[in-house]
Amino acid sequence: MKLKVIDNLKEKTEPLSHSEAGKLVALIRRNTLDVHQGEYRLEDLERLVAFATPEKIQEEMNRGYLAMLFADDENLIGCVLVVRKGLKLVIKTLQVKMSFCRKGHGSLLYEQCENLFRLMGSNEMEVEVPKFPSSQAFYQSRGFVKTGNPTQKDLSFAMFKYI
């Protein structure tokens, strides 16, 4: 496994290439559709991944943090994107390719985030979570609680944790 990190939270130090942005978009969109097919209508799933275009991902990365997990030099199997919302940092998405789930890869990516939040001096974490039972369970097992702030017309909600 290979972990690649791009950290532009304090200042833009490294751009995200269009090619890498395309790989991220493909992972986010394919993963959301594969994992949650049947739980929501296709148009609802499309709304959940509307942020996943190469241009929007590149824009988020101008002041964001991205960790990408590769099985080899080319095979992207997971990612986590942290963005700024005002003064706060928020986990925008954490994705692991379905065939690599439940093998510790999501935990590895999450731990990158928790370490980042601590290094940035934050004592709290927030994440935007699609209303999928598996996503909610993942974060609850790490101490997050629902804040009750629905987003995207009730397709997702925020979860919060003190660190």
Model-found features: residue ranges?
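Conserved beta-strand-loop-alpha-helix junction that forms the acyl-donor binding cleft
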Residues: 126-136, 152-156
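Short, solvent-exposed polar/charged micro-motifs at secondary-structure junctions
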Residues: 49, 157-158
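Short acidic/polar active-site loop segments enriched in Thr and Asp
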Residues: 123, 145
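Conserved glycine-rich acetyl-CoA-binding loop
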Residues: 75, 93-111, 118-120, 130-137, ...
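Acetyl-CoA-dependent GNAT
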Residues: 3-11, 15-19, 26-93, 97-98, ...
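Glycine-centered loop/turn positions within well-structured domains
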Residues: 89, 103, 157
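Short beta-strand-to-coil "C-cap" segments at the C-terminal boundary of structured domains/repeats
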Residues: 160-163
